[in-house]
């Protein structure tokens, strides 16, 4: 038997809007920093060729990263440096009219994956899979901050209190071995997959990474941009992933699946060993169902809960996570004998995370996310 399929059951492209928000309170002064990441088109492709009991499959997709985000008003971690400088030169008093800040930050992270694998149908109830994925990371940060003292601070009026310039590109690559199995027992379907940890180091190609205090450039010690200096390599491993799913066919037209994902985050290398601060690796629980309303139409719905095991030392303005739950809905429309169109929408609600810096300083991290997907399956 020969069969060639070009498909993506999830998406041909995705339109995504992700909003990152950081609320900061330092020295009695509150700040609100909003970053918007909008991705109007993220393509992905999958294909499979089957002959007898063997199937070879391949795909190309954006498999990770946070996309592009722009913080037009900068970040609280940089503004707090300004407030600390004002606190020092003003004798401990800080009011907004003592200084002015002009600041902005853009960041991007994309992991592109090319995957190839081979499946074998062992018997009527067992199929196995082995393959791998090549991951290529590209991203970086570009931003600036200029803070100037006002004339109501004696001696320092008009002087640059803090200056920051950052222009850094990052690249890296790594290989992910993948194993899987599929078991079919009557109306029950069990799926297992394990993705091994991917060793990934990001190398900086930096044009600027300078922090100035009172006009003097800082050295590496205590410099918040030391990790972004030219040539620095930063570990950014992709954690190993174990997934297990159990599906049941209630009716020939009605199916449901319960699924569990575990990311072994604490065993992966990350910048400044921040993974050690996590309480545990990421847990994800998913449940979904699909119903064949008619011969040409299938609808589906699902729920996902994600728990990262977060801790204060893991979170920063540049990189943070929030526990969440997602609701999704989709439909598959059979257009012809060979062509099926898939549409989907999901919305994610994130829990706010509060990080206490000191008795007078805290950051609150939050997000919102909405995604629309469109895909096609074509069987030759």
What are these regions (language model features)?
Residues 18-38:
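Surface-exposed strand-loop-strand hairpins of Gram-negative outer-membrane beta-barrel proteins
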Residues 1-18:
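Transmembrane beta-strand segments of Gram-negative outer membrane beta-barrel proteins
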Residues 5-7, 39-42, 46-380:
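Outer-membrane beta-barrel porins/channels
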């Amino acid at each position: 038997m020969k069969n060639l399929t070009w498909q993506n059951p999830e998406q041909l492209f995705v339109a995504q809007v992700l909003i990152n928000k950081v609320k900061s309170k330092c020295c009695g002064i509150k700040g609100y920093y909003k970053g918007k990441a909008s991705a109007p088109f993220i393509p992905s492709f999958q294909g499979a060729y089957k002959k007898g009991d063997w199937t070879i499959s391949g795909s190309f997709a954006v498999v990770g990263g946070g996309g592009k985000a722009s913080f037009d008003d900068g970040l609280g971690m940089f503004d707090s440096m300004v407030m600390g400088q004002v606190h020092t030169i003003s004798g401990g008093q800080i009011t907004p009219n003592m200084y002015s800040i002009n600041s902005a930050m853009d960041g991007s992270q994309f992991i592109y994956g090319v995957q190839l694998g081979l499946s074998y149908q062992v018997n009527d109830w067992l199929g196995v899979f082995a393959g791998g994925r090549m991951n290529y990371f590209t991203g970086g940060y570009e931003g600036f901050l200029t803070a100037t003292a006002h004339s109501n601070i004696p001696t320092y009026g008009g002087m640059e209190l803090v200056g920051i310039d950052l222009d850094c590109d990052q690249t890296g690559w790594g290989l992910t071995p993948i194993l899987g199995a599929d078991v079919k027992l009557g109306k029950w379907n069990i799926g297992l997959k394990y993705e091994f940890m991917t060793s990934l180091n990001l190398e900086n190609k930096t044009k600027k990474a300078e922090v100035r205090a009172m006009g003097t450039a800082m050295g590496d010690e205590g410099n918040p941009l030391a990790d972004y200096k030219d040539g620095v390599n930063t570990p950014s491993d992709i954690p190993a992933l174990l997934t297990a799913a159990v599906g049941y066919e209630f009716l020939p037209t009605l199916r449901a699946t319960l699924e569990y994902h575990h990311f072994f985050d604490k065993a992966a290398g990350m910048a400044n060993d921040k993974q050690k601060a996590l309480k545990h690796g990421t847990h994800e629980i998913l449940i979904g169902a699909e119903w064949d309303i008619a011969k040409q139409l299938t609808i589906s719905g699902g729920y996902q809960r994600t728990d990262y095991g977060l801790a204060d030392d893991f979170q920063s303005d540049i990189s943070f996570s929030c526990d969440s739950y997602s609701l999704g809905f989709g439909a598959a429309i059979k257009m012809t004998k060979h062509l099926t169109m898939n549409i989907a929408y999901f919305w994610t609600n994130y829990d706010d995370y509060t990080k206490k810096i000191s008795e007078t300083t805290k950051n609150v991290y939050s997000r919102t996310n909405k995604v629309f997907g469109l895909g096609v399956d074509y069987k030759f």
